[in-house]
Amino acid sequence: METRTAENTAIFMCKCCNLFSPNQSELVTHVSEKHGEEGVNVDDVIIPLRPLNTPENPNPSKGGDEFLVMKRKRGRPKGSTKKPSTEEEVVENLVSPSEDGPLATEEGSRLAPSSLECSKCCRKFSNTRQLRKHICIIVLNLGEEDGDAGNESDLDLEKTYKEDDREKASKRPRAQKTEKVQKISGKEAGQLSGAKKPIISVVLTAHEAIPGATKIIPVEAGPPETGAPPPETTAADLVPRRGYQEYAIQQTPYEQPMKSSRLGPTQLKIFTCEYCNKVFKFKHSLQAHLRIHTNEKPYKCSQCSYASAIKANLNVHLRKHTGEKFACDYCSFTCLSKGHLKVHIERVHKKIKQHCRFCKKKYSDVKNLIKHIRDMHDPQDKKVKEALDELRLMTREGKRQLLYDCHICERKFKNELDRDRHMLVHGDKWPFACELCGHGATKYQALELHVRKHPFVYVCALCLKKFVSSIRLRSHIREVHGAAQETLVFTSSINQSFCLLEPGGDIQQEALGDQLQLAAEEFVCPEIDVRKEEACPGEAQPEVGLRELVVPGDAHAPPPGPLATPQSESSSLSPCKLETTVVSSDLNSLGVVSDDFLLKSDTSSAEPPAAAEATSDTQHRDSAQTQGEEVTLLLAKAKSAGPDPESSPGGRQKVGALPASESDSSTCLRANPTEASDLLPTVTDGGDLGVCQPDSCTPSSEHHPGSTAFMKVLDSLQKKQMNTSLCERIRKVYGDLECEYCGKLFWYQVHFDMHVRTHTREHLYYCSQCHYSSITKNCLKRHVIQKHSNILLKCPTDGCDYSTPDKYKLQAHLKVHTELDKRSYSCPVCEKSFSEDRLIKSHIKTNHPEVSMNTISEVLGRRVQLKGLIGKRAMKCPYCDFYFMKNGSDLQRHIWAHEGVKPFKCSLCEYATRSKSNLKAHMNRHSTEKTHLCDMCGKKFKSKGTLKSHKLLHTSDGKQFKCTVCDYTAAQKPQLLRHMEQHASFKPFRCAHCHYSCNISGSLKRHYNRKHPNEEYTNVGSGELAAEALIQQGGLKCPVCSFVYGTKWEFNRHLKNKHGLKVVEIDGDPKWEPAAETPEEPSTQYLYITEAEDVQGTQAAVAALQDLRYTSESGDRLDPTAVNILQQIIELGSETHDAAAVASVVAMAPGTVTVVKQVTDEEPSSNHTVMIQETLQQASVELAEQHHLVVSSDDVEGIETVTVYTQGGEASEFIVYVQEAVQPVEEQVGEQPAPEL
């Protein structure tokens, strides 16, 4: 409507919608039609606006338009080509030139603050130019093409804001534009932003313009009810508002398991803002967006009062103080933001324009092109609509609402790159695969992080196939190399395996002693790589990545870096051992060298070594050609000095290789060829071990990029050579329960079972309120608290309203309020700064894994340690060699046993114990109350454990322990042992108050405690008889030691537990054989042969052991024939000596000593013991592999003379320890060495 003609008349305005009219009756009709339901008074809504006197024009020659233009204080933005428009300035002042100045100034100042606020996201701006370029204003109605007629005013409003800059003011009446601006500038703007409809759901629809894409469409609630708000609204406002809604899109599960053990995510989460209903795919971008609504600006400048909600904006601002700017390469343009420089180059120099498909217009910005198409072309047209959909994808608003679909499994992804990587999963081969566990990755970085999780790499000594655990290695040897000796092959494989050590990992020197140090000195793992020559000599093959061999003691070697072995640690190695000829002879002796690797050394030697290599190359060229393939072994020069070693003819060494099918397997070679040849002694002799044939054992990987990537990752990792002693030491520290799937070690079975379920995906705990399931009970408990409870943990800081159901999130939030964690942490490698310690730790572990933990500790100012890959490390007892879990109660009780402390004491008697549970069980003896009732038979018990054991009797498979004499079965082993007392023919222990008798003193004491608690313990039986008397009454004497047992089952149990033997009757004659190896028993078995009653028989046994070449690997493989030979030898000298003198001959592994104390039949055998397996760590000499030690005694009364028989060594150089055996106590204490003889 036109208002210029009413110079002296009043103009009426509707306060509800800011509608102007010179006729009051028209506004009355308007209010009754539009605002009648609101119950407003017409006189209060319609107000008259009367013009004031216009001040004198200082320049009468110029009109009011020019006067308003001259008042503009802000000029053109830097770099802008737009000219000032008088119409825009009139819009900014919100008045017409015909109106009086004072009224215009007052009205403009009153409406200006609200006019600079976005009606969609409520963000405020300092000027109209920023508001017009705001993303919400530009794309406000991009998704409202099909809107109803009630939104026409809003559509016109947006068109006003998105009006093209080139259109002049004369095209549209000035008053009409003023009216439209006021529609969002006045009071209703706040109403629109405050009455935003909440989102109740999210709908996914297929995108019309892009195949394979899905658009996220939020569904808003219905229109709010007009009328007074309910009284509950005030109470609801008091609840802390989270500010966003979270939606989970269920992912389609895989129809068949993937090659990887991982399962894809079952849900895809998206988020919506509760204030402006915007959709976000990532939570971090939503959190940054929410700061706009909360006016939170945590990033503050330390030099001025500037603050920002986004950290990147603060970084740009700081360049104002530092003077750092980005300069254009084509002109003198400079700016503070790298993004602004990119836009400048595209617009000014590259002349990149966005062309309209329907006319000849072109724009420098996609947003302006979208605005042009909507204003000048019909959005309802099909082609126009498709063009708009494509252009929206070039904006942040359009990309934010787009998901990408997999057309095979219909899974959805937040970005196109993840979808493309996922498509590789449906192929035949993973692009990046792990050869140890079969894990597949679609990124090289993901494979690199995955391989670092494997603590060990076990290599088969025959076929060089790699395994993630020793369990799979044993299974492989048993299934594929069944004809070979399993123990010998397994030991050789352990010696060729290695452990992957991350810098700062959890294999520490204080835990493993000097084992790693010795392994590093005796072995240098060569960094090897592949170079296979094709039939075409002119075609070059790409390098896979050369591995570096650190040569200690070399004068030309570079200083040791983070991954290099220190020169001082391995100075005993001679550099001549690493010559090419030595390596080639080493490889030929083994016969199992793969052609996949190159041997590279960081040496900068001159031409003489190269000439020697050339000579060696000439000598071995013919032998290499007979193998059908050539393998290049290269001692390369340093990267920074010397010519390319590949181009040097003297830098090549050809040796024999394996077939092509084994070319992708790796091995670690010893620097000493003699040690390497000893690993597989029967391979070169053509024995049973033989080289694995290609058809019988094919490596897991073929020649494809995944295998190459895995080898490159393996080459870049730090390694330590493994051996049997180091392996046993690691298992003693970290536990002997090994995970088959990843090689991790555990101490306790409950932890091991829980870990295995992470690989098998066996979920035992299910949520009763949703479909959630978890592996552990704690995860389920945390889920219930977070998702299904109204428990909120509030921040205790004054003035902070933060609350969360997760205690871990609250702990992370509390760091914001601490001054210590507000400091910035800088990466020592790339100098990138982080605000939290966890962020810099994750950054270093991901991007700079070579940084040691000491460096990270210095950066953070405290000692830190990454999560152990092997497992939880145990602590050694300060009094003995036993290991216990770190900070565990078992260690404390063990130390109390050494110190004789029993802190838990009974208040009713003198009983004391070191365990609280034992005290609780003891207190049940003073109580007659039985509170635990069996629901099957009604029997009552005092403790829960007793009830649990009793319930096993009601199950079919509960009685697993059977008597070997009668049909008795028991649910527990102690019950069976108690039953076996009934079958004893001789019972030397008898009660003085009843007819009870038994053959064990402990059973009689238990009888007194239960049946005669007030009587003193007294044995009225004959007590323990001498060995001869017990034998006369049917007892059995141990053939190894002097113990005699009254029953056969006690005798068999003694042989199995103490000596590892079992009785096997062959044709009626009893024979002693080594007991079958069980998982609980150690891998090294000690075989006790027979009795020897004089020195002569002992010497004969030693000679027999020398002929049999007894070693630790073959000790448990001796057949009964060899045992019988030794028995016959010992019996040769037994006729001329006293039969009362009893000694033992034992065959032991290298490095052990056995001390046997001679006793007579009159002495009670329970007062002494046989000490075995005392490791000679204090010896001044090192034992070779074939050393054997047999120790016996010549004195009858006591040990005064010790005879030591050795093979290849001086007996005087060994230290022998003797210790008296003690009676068993409640807590077994580790044996302490006695003074040396």
Swiss-Prot record:
Biased composition (Polar residues): 565-574
GO terms, biological process: hematopoietic progenitor cell differentiation; hemopoiesis; spongiotrophoblast layer development
Compartments, as annotated in UniProt: Nucleus; Cytoplasm, Cytosol
Binding residues for Zn(2+) 2: 301, 304, 317, 321
Key words, A-Z: Cytoplasm, DNA-binding, Metal-binding, Nucleus, Repeat, Transcription, Transcription regulation, Zinc, Zinc-finger
Residues annotated to bind Zn(2+) 7: 767, 770, 783, 788
Protein name listed in UniProt: Zinc finger protein ZFAT
Name of the gene: Zfat
